[in-house]
C-alpha cells in the first residue's frame, strides 16, 4: 500500500500513439489493484503519474493493460511500463511490452527479469505461461508453402500475419517506396527493353544506372580478371561454396590431351593449395522457359589454386557432370582462347547467382530464421529468458518472407520472369539444398574447419565470421548462465526442450539425421545452439545479403539466366557470348531487384543495437554492455584493416550487420 510512481513509454513509429483510453492494474504476490483509466498515450512519449494504492500488493509480478474504445479501435504500441513502489526505498519494476495493444482484451505483462520454469518453483507465472502459449499457438501456425521444403508461418499474405510481426509504419513506407522506384525504373527503361539482344558487353552500361556502389563500379571494370573471379569465392556475395580439396573430385573426368592439367591439379593437391567450388546441386534442375524461350542451366565445377600472395586463381572449369556412355564434357582452362574462357566463367557466375539466392540467401538465411521465429513464438513465453534473448533478432522476418513468397519466388514472380531456375526449378533446387543443410554448416567454427578455410589469410569472410561467432557465443553464455546454473536446469526446462524439438522435428521436418539436436542436455550445448540461431539471423544473413548490390549489379558478372546451352566445344565468339547472356528485359529486371534487395536501408538496426530492453535487470544489462563493447572493438579493427586492403571487406562489420532478417 502507498503511492506508486508509474511511467508508460510509447513507441516512436508512426501511429504508435492512440486516442483510446488505457486502463492499468498492478498484480503482486499478495494482491491486485485497479488503477483505473490513466492515459491516452502519445507517440514517442513517456507518461508519468502517481497512484495511491490502498491494498498491500507485495512484490509485483504483472501489470495488466486494457485499451478501451467506443467507436474506433486505435491500436497503441507500448514499449514498456515502469512501476516504482511506495517510499524512497521502494523497488522499481520494469514490465517490457514492445507490442501492439488493440481491441478490448486485457494484456498481462510479466515483470522483466525473466525466469525459466525451473526458476519459477512457486508457479507464480505458470498460468500466465500456459495461457500465453495457448494463445500464441493459435496465432502462429505452421504452414507448408511447398511440399518437401522446410515449414513456414501459415500466412498467404501480410494481412494474415499477427500484427506484431508486420512492418511498423516507418519501415513499411520506406520499403514500399523502394518498390515504387523499381517499377518506375522499369517503365523508364522500356525503350531499352524492346531491344531483343545486346550487341556487345558495353551495351550492359545502358542499365548500369545511378544508384550503384563504388564496388559495383570496380566489378564492372575488373570482372574479367581471373584473380577477381577467384576472389569472389573467398569474400564475394556467396562465400559458402568454396572448400579445400582433399582429393580430385570424382566428376573430374579428363578428356584426352589434358594430362598436363591433371598433373598440375595433383601437384596443387599435394601442396594443400587446391580448392574447389562444386555446383552439383544444379544438376538435373529443369531450366526456365521465359516468354516461350527456353533458358539453360549448368552444374559447374571450378578448380582453383591458392597463390603465395593469397590470390585464388581458377585453373580449370568443367560446366557439366559426365554422363555414362557419353564423351566427357570439355574442361576449360586459362590457356584456352580468351572468349571460351570468359564464357566458361560467365556460366560459373550465373550458377553462383542461382545458388546464392536460393541456397545461401533464401534457405540458409530467410527460411531458417523464419523457422526459429515461429518455433520461438509457439514454445517460449515472453517471460522466458531465451525468448528475451532471441526476439530482437526475429524482428520483421515473417513479413519479409511473406513478401518474398508473394513477389520473388511465387508463380509469375521475379524468378519466373528472369531467372534460369524459375518456372519450378527453383522449388526443386530449394528441396535439394534443404536435404544438404546440416547443423554444422550453420556453425562457422565447424563449417570453416570442414571446408579448410580457417588458415587462409585473404579469406576475410572466414576471419570475421569466426570472430563474430565467438563474440556472440560469449554474449549468449553470459545471458544464459544468469538463469541456468547447472546442466540439469537445462534438461528440466520443458519449454526450452519443446522449442528445440519444434525447430528440428517440425520446422525442419525431422533434421536429426543432419545433426540438428532434438534436445539440449547441457549449458554448453544449449548456448551453442542459441548462438547458431542468432548468428544465422544476423551475421550469416548479412554476409550473403550485403554484397548483392556490389557483385550482381553488373549483369555479366552474375547473369540471372543463360539463353543458350553450355558450350560443348571451344569455339566461342562475341556473338555467341551476347546471345547467351541475359537480354535487355531480363537485365533490367535483375538490376531492379538487386537494387531493391541490396540497397542500404534507411530503417536499419545494427547488430546488438536494438533499443528494446527485454532484460531490465543490472546483471543482464552488464552482459549486453560487454557485448556491445566487443562489437564496437571488432568494428574498429575491421575499419583499420580495410584501409590497407585493395578491396575492403565490410559485410561482417558489426555496424553493417542487420540485427535481424528484415530485408
UniProtKB/Swiss-Prot annotation:
Listed Gene3D superfamilies: 3.10.450.60, Lipoxygenase-1, Domain 5, PLAT/LH2 domain
Residues annotated as binding Fe cation: 361, 366, 541, 545, 663
Covalent S-S links between cysteines: none
Tissues in which the UniProt entry reports expression: Detected in leukocytes, lung and aorta.
SUPFAM superfamilies: Lipase/lipooxygenase domain (PLAT/LH2 domain) (SSF49723), Lipoxigenase (SSF48484)
Gene Ontology BP term (one): positive regulation of cell-substrate adhesion
Subcellular location: Cytoplasm, Cytosol; Cell membrane; Lipid droplet
Residue ranges occupied by any Lipoxygenase domain in the UniProt entry: 116-663
Gene: Alox15
Main location: cytoplasm
Reaction catalyzed: (5Z,8Z,11Z,14Z)-eicosatetraenoate + O2 = (12S)-hydroperoxy-(5Z,8Z,10E,14Z)-eicosatetraenoate; (5Z,8Z,11Z,14Z)-eicosatetraenoate + O2 = (15S)-hydroperoxy-(5Z,8Z,11Z,13E)-eicosatetraenoate; (9Z,12Z)-octadecadienoate + O2 = (13S)-hydroperoxy-(9Z,11E)-octadecadienoate; (12S)-hydroperoxy-(5Z,8Z,10E,14Z)-eicosatetraenoate = (8S)-hydroxy-(11S,12S)-epoxy-(5Z,9E,14Z)-eicosatrienoate
Named cofactor requirement(s): Fe cation
Keyword Transcription: no
EC number(s) per entry: 1.13.11.31, 1.13.11.33, 1.13.11.-, 1.13.11.12
Job of this protein: Non-heme iron-containing dioxygenase that catalyzes the stereo-specific peroxidation of free and esterified polyunsaturated fatty acids generating a spectrum of bioactive lipid mediators. It inserts peroxyl groups at C12 or C15 of arachidonate ((5Z,8Z,11Z,14Z)-eicosatetraenoate) producing both 12-hydroperoxyeicosatetraenoate/12-HPETE and 15-hydroperoxyeicosatetraenoate/15-HPETE. It may then act on 12-HPETE to produce hepoxilins, which may show pro-inflammatory properties. Can also peroxidize linoleate ((9Z,12Z)-octadecadienoate) to 13-hydroperoxyoctadecadienoate.
Assembly notes: Interacts with PEBP1; in response to IL13/interleukin-13, prevents the interaction of PEBP1 with RAF1 to activate the ERK signaling cascade.
GO molecular function, one term: linoleate 13S-lipoxygenase activity
Record's protein name: Polyunsaturated fatty acid lipoxygenase ALOX15
Pathway terms, separated by semicolons: Lipid metabolism; hydroperoxy eicosatetraenoic acid biosynthesis
Origin superkingdom: Eukaryota
Organism in which the protein naturally occurs: Rattus norvegicus
Domain PLAT: 2-115
Cofactor note: Binds 1 Fe cation per subunit.
Keyword presence, Ubl conjugation: no
Phylogenetic classification of the source organism: Eukaryota, Metazoa, Chordata, Craniata, Vertebrata
UniProt note: domains: The PLAT domain can bind calcium ions; this promotes association with membranes.
Pfam family, one: PLAT
Amino acid at each position: 500500500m502507498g503511492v506508486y510512481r508509474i511511467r508508460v513509454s510509447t513507441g516512436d513509429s508512426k501511429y504508435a500513439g492512440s486516442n483510446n483510453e488505457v486502463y492499468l492494474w498492478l498484480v503482486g504476490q499478495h494482491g491486485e489493484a485497479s488503477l483505473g483509466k490513466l492515459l491516452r498515450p502519445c507517440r514517442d512519449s513517456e507518461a508519468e503519474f502517481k497512484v495511491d494504492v490502498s491494498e498491500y500488493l507485495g512484490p509485483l509480478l504483472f501489470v495488466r493493460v486494457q485499451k478501451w474504445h467506443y467507436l474506433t479501435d486505435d491500436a497503441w504500441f507500448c514499449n514498456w511500463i515502469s512501476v516504482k513502489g511506495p517510499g524512497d526505498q521502494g523497488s522499481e519494476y520494469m514490465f517490457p511490452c514492445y507490442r501492439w495493444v488493440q481491441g478490448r482484451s486485457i494484456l498481462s505483462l510479466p515483470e522483466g527479469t525473466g525466469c525459466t520454469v525451473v526458476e519459477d518453483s512457486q508457479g507464480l507465472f505458470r498460468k500466465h505461461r500456459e495461457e500465453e502459449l495457448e494463445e500464441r499457438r493459435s496465432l502462429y501456425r505452421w504452414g507448408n508453402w511447398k511440399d518437401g521444403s522446410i515449414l513456414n508461418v501459415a500466412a498467404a499474405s501480410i494481412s494474415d500475419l499477427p500484427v506484431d510481426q508486420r512492418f511498423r509504419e516507418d519501415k513499411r513506407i520506406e520499403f514500399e517506396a523502394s518498390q515504387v522506384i523499381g517499377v518506375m525504373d522499369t517503365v523508364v527503361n522500356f525503350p531499352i527493353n524492346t531491344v531483343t539482344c545486346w550487341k556487345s558487353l558495353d551495351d550492359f552500361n545502358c542499365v548500369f544506372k545511378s544508384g550503384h556502389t563504388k564496388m559495383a563500379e570496380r566489378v564492372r571494370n575488373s570482372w574479367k580478371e581471373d584473380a577477381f573471379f577467384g576472389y569472389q569465392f573467398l569474400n564475394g556475395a556467396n562465400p559458402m561454396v568454396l572448400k579445400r580439396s582433399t582429393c580430385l573430385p570424382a566428376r573430374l573426368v579428363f578428356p584426352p590431351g589434358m594430362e598436363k592439367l591433371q598433373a598440375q591439379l595433383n601437384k596443387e593437391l599435394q601442396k594443400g593449395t587446391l580448392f574447389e567450388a562444386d555446383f552439383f546441386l544444379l544438376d538435373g534442375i529443369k531450366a526456365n522457359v521465359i516468354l516461350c524461350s527456353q533458358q539453360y542451366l549448368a552444374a559447374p565445377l571450378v578448380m582453383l589454386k591458392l597463390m603465395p600472395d593469397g590470390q585464388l586463381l581458377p585453373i580449370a572449369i568443367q560446366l557439366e557432370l559426365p554422363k555414362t556412355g557419353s564423351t566427357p564434357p570439355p574442361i576449360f582452362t586459362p590457356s584456352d582462347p580468351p572468349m571460351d574462357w570468359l564464357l566458361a566463367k560467365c556460366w560459373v557466375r550465373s550458377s553462383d547467382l542461382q545458388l546464392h539466392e536460393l541456397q545461401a540467401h533464401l534457405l540458409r538465411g530467410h527460411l531458417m530464421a523464419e523457422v526459429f521465429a515461429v518455433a520461438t513464438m509457439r514454445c517460449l513465453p515472453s517471460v522466458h529468458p531465451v525468448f528475451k534473448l532471441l526476439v530482437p533478432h526475429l524482428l520483421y522476418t515473417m513479413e519479409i518472407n511473406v513478401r518474398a513468397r508473394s513477389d520473388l519466388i511465387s508463380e509469375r514472380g521475379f524468378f519466373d520472369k528472369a531467372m534460369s531456375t524459375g518456372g519450378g526449378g527453383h522449388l526443386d533446387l530449394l528441396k535439394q539444398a534443404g536435404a544438404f543443410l546440416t547443423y554444422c554448416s550453420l556453425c562457422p567454427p565447424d563449417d570453416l574447419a570442414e571446408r579448410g578455410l580457417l588458415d587462409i589469410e585473404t579469406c576475410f569472410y572466414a576471419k570475421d565470421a569466426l570472430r563474430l561467432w565467438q563474440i556472440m557465443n560469449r554474449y549468449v553464455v553470459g545471458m544464459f548462465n544468469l538463469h541456468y546454473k547447472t546442466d540439469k536446469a537445462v534438461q528440466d526446462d520443458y519449454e526450452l526442450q519443446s522449442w528445440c524439438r519444434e525447430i528440428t522435428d517440425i520446422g525442419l521436418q525431422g533434421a536429426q539425421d543432419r545433426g540438428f539436436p532434438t534436445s539440449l542436455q547441457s549449458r554448453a550445448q544449449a548456448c551453442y545452439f542459441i548462438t547458431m540461431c542468432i548468428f544465422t539471423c544476423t551475421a550469416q544473413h548479412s554476409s550473403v545479403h550485403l554484397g548483392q548490390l556490389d557483385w550482381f549489379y553488373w549483369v555479366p558478372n552474375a547473369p540471372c539466366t543463360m539463353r543458350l546451352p553450355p558450350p560443348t566445344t571451344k569455339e566461342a565468339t562475341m556473338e555467341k557470348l551476347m546471345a547467351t547472356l541475359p537480354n535487355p528485359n531480363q537485365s533490367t529486371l535483375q538490376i531492379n531487384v538487386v537494387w531493391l534487395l541490396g540497397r542500404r536501408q534507411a530503417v536499419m538496426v545494427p547488430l546488438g543495437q536494438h533499443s528494446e530492453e527485454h532484460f531490465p535487470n543490472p546483471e543482464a544489462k552488464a552482459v549486453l554492455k560487454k557485448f556491445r563493447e566487443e562489437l564496437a572493438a571488432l568494428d574498429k579493427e575491421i575499419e583499420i584493416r580495410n584501409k590497407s586492403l585493395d578491396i575492403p571487406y565490410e559485410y561482417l562489420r558489426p555496424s553493417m550487420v542487420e540485427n535481424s532478417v528484415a530485408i
